C-alpha cells in the first residue's frame, strides 16, 4: 500500500495510515528506524508484513515490518457524508475521506464547541474532540494530536469553531466504538438550501420591487392578530425576517 499520513514515531515504532486503489490500512506500532521514518513521505509504496488485529472496532495491522517499494500513489478524499449512519460506511474504514456540509453541535452541556480530550480534562496540545451533525444524527470527530498537533491549521480551525457553524472536513476514517474520524482539514461549508423550488431567497425578496408578487418560506415567530379570516404574523428564517400583514387565514 501507499503511505497517506504518518501519525507518530517513538522508540523505533511508527504508526501510519496507508491506502491503495482498493482500500486502506492502519499500521500500528510498525517497526521503523528514525532514518526510515523520514523516508515514509506521502505516496511512498511499502510492503508490510504483520498481524491483523482489532481494537474497539478499529481493524489494524500490528507488530509489522515493512520494506520500501517502487511506486507512488496519493489518494483523493472520498466524500462519505451520505454514508453516515449506514452499513456502507465501515467498508471505507481507514480511507482518506471527506465530509461536507456538517453542522457543529455543542460538545458538552456548557455549550462548548470542542473539548481538550474526550472528557474535557486536557489542555492545549491534547487531542481535540468535537461534535457535528448530519440528517439529525450527531457524531464525534477528533483531531488526533500526534497526527495534527497544535501548530497545524486544522488544530487552530477546530479551536475557532462555533456551535452552529457549517463545515467541510477531510481526514481518515478511524473507528473507536463506532465511527470516529481523525480530521486533518476543516473549511467553511455551504449551508444547504431548505427552501422549496420557486421560493425566493431573502436577498431576492429584498430586491423585489414594491407591489410585486413574492413567494417566501419562513418560520412563525409571533402572531399579532386575527380578524375576519385575516392574520398578521411575524416570520423569520436564517437570513432575515418578514412582516405578513392581513394574510388570508381561517380561524
Model-found features: residue ranges?
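OB-fold single-stranded nucleic acid-binding module
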Residues: 2-251
